[in-house]
UniProtKB/Swiss-Prot annotation:
Residues 1-203 are annotated as: Precorrin-2 dehydrogenase /sirohydrochlorin ferrochelatase. It comes from Actinobacillus succinogenes (strain ATCC 55618 / DSM 22257 / CCUG 43843 / 130Z). In the N-terminal section; belongs to the precorrin-2 dehydrogenase / sirohydrochlorin ferrochelatase family. Then it catalyzes the NAD-dependent ring dehydrogenation of precorrin-2 to yield sirohydrochlorin. Finally, it catalyzes the ferrochelation of sirohydrochlorin to yield siroheme. CDD domains: SUMT (cd11642). NCBIfam families: cobA_cysG_Cterm, cysG_Nterm, PRK06136.1, PRK10637.1. Its EC number is 2.1.1.107, 1.3.1.76, 4.99.1.4. Keywords: Cobalamin biosynthesis, Lyase, Methyltransferase, Multifunctional enzyme, NAD, Oxidoreductase, Phosphoprotein, Porphyrin biosynthesis, S-adenosyl-L-methionine, Transferase. S-adenosyl-L-methionine binds at P223, G299, G300, D301, V304, T329, A330, M381, G410. This is Siroheme synthase. HAMAP family: Siroheme_synth (MF_01646).
Length: 476
């Protein structure tokens, strides 16, 4: 690290600016925001600086620069178009061990100005160390868009209440949970709407509550690629005390969980070791009743074949508060990464999602509906029943030549797309690693044209082998 980032307290501290033009004015305005005692050395001032002088905001030392002017100041800034004068200011400041900045001359700077995102009292500074100022500015612009304007008001009010909160809530965990809940709740929304007094009242009401009760967030982790986790989902897993996750949550996403959170595996896999749903429900209740902030992290979307509704029913019965963060379901993510659009005007006017893993006493499937042409059928957890699925679809009218895809480990680096026809579905599914998704419909023919994920697409190398009507393509 070439520059050490610090935030300097300039309140009422003397700062010397040498120069009276536009560049100097920009620096002066920045310094005044920090309540610095600004002194300007210049033969003359531009209109902006003249106005500040006449208002009494700055002290003007009219005349030439000399070394005595630096003696009792905290910072020195040289902002003239005279290279010789700037060099002299730098050397004098260095000799007196003063922090000095010569504008646009990094070699003559003992400190530099970062790009600033100001949400007073919250401040974010971005610097490239002078190597790429345009890049730093672009980064600042992105952060400006991300950080809400009311952050400063949130920090200001919470700072005034810190002592009361510390008195009321004795443990660090209680206080952390209180502030996290406050900043992510109605308090923040009121400040966003410029309802400051109502926000203060909300804080007071929340503090009077008993915050020992826990909370559960049901979060969809998406299909695997960590980049597809929603921003709100990321916020939830980084605030959690306990995360209960299933087998479909990728290691990439688990790496994003708060480091000191407890990770509890509650996964289910067909023909594998499973955690019973009743045990998962019991754990959710147990941790919430211990006053913990619990995240139930599910692959894909928790309300699409994820039994999320069943888990929330248990929480509702016990009056445990909860929230839901949707995720990108596997049918959306995996097909997109495989270059298979779910709908297309030429091939499919609808898409149907079904599960191949049904409750033992479930009513029979409407195969006639699933076998319709001009639609895309996506089957979750269907590889073990692929033979029966293929037979039933053909029995109810789907042609054996209908294109199909089996997408394994969708959206992840290990993704494999297995292409074939309905007659070969059982054979294809048997050779496909799980978890896998079955796609049935003419849209699969677009895969060759639209596949984009994986290095081999761009290298024009598509390793494959043929097994009757089976083709396997790997992105690994």
């Amino acid at each position: 690290m070439h520059y050490f980032p610090v935030f300097a307290d300039l309140n009422n501290r003397p700062v010397l600016v040498v120069g009276g033009g536009g560049v100097a004015a920009r620096k002066v305005n920045l310094l005044l925001k920090a309540n610095a005692d600004v002194r300007i050395v210049a033969q003359k001032l531009n209109a902006e600086l003249t106005a500040l002088f006449e208002l009494g905001h700055i002290l003007w030392i009219a005349g030439e620069f000399n070394s005595e002017q630096i003696r009792n100041v905290f910072l020195v800034i040289a902002a003239t178009d005279d290279e010789y004068l700037n060099e002299r200011v730098f050397r004098v400041a260095e000799s007196q061990q003063k922090l000095v900045n010569v504008v646009d001359d990094q070699a003559r700077c003992s400190f530099i100005f970062p790009s600033i995102i100001d949400r007073n009292p919250i401040q974010v500074a971005v610097s490239s160390g002078g190597t790429a100022p345009v890049l730093a500015r672009l980064l600042r612009e992105k952060l400006e868009a991300l950080l809400p304007q009311h952050l400063g008001a949130m920090a200001d009010i919470s700072g005034k209440w810190r002592h009361k909160v510390k008195t009321k809530l004795k443990t660090v965990t209680e206080r952390r949970r209180f502030w996290e809940s406050l900043f992510n709740g109605r308090f923040s929304q009121l400040l966003k709407n410029r309802q400051t007094e109502a926000a203060k009242k909300e804080l007071e009401l929340q503090l009077d509550k008993d915050y020992r009760g826990g909370f559960v967030s049901l979060v969809g982790a998406g299909p695997g690629d960590a980049g597809l986790l929603t921003l709100k989902g990321l916020q939830e897993i980084q605030q959690a005390d306990v995360v209960l996750y299933d087998a479909l949550v990728s290691d990439e996403i688990l790496e994003l969980v708060r480091r000191d959170a407890k990770l509890v595996f509650v996964g289910k896999r067909a023909q594998g070791k499973q955690v019973a749903q009743e045990n998962t429900n019991a754990l959710l209740v147990k941790y919430a009743q211990q006053g913990k902030r619990v995240v139930r992290l599910k692959g894909g979307d928790p309300f699409v074949f994820g039994r999320g509704g069943e888990e929330l029913e248990v929480l509702a019965e016990r009056q445990i508060p909860f929230s839901v963060v949707p995720g990108i379901t596997a049918a959306i993510g995996a097909t997109a990464y495989a270059g298979i659009p779910l709908t297309h005007r030429d091939y499919a006017q609808s898409a149907v999602f079904v599960t191949g893993h049904r409750k033992a006493n479930a009513s029979d499937i409407e195969w006639q509906t699933l076998a319709r042409s001009n639609q895309t059928l996506v089957i979750y957890m269907g590889t073990l029943k692929a033979k029966d699925i293929a037979e039933r679809l053909q029995q109810f009218g789907r042609a054996g030549s209908t294109p199909i895809a089996v997408i394994s480990q969708g959206t992840q680096a290990r993704q494999k797309t297995h292409i074939g026809t309905l007659t070969a579905l059982a054979e294809i599914a048997e050779n496909a690693p799980t978890p896998a998704l079955i796609v049935v419909g003419e849209v699969v023919t677009l895969h060759d044209k639209l596949a984009w994920f994986g290095e081999q697409k761009f290298a024009q190398k598509r390793p494959h082998f043929t097994l009757d009507s089976l083709r396997i393509e790997s992105v690994a």
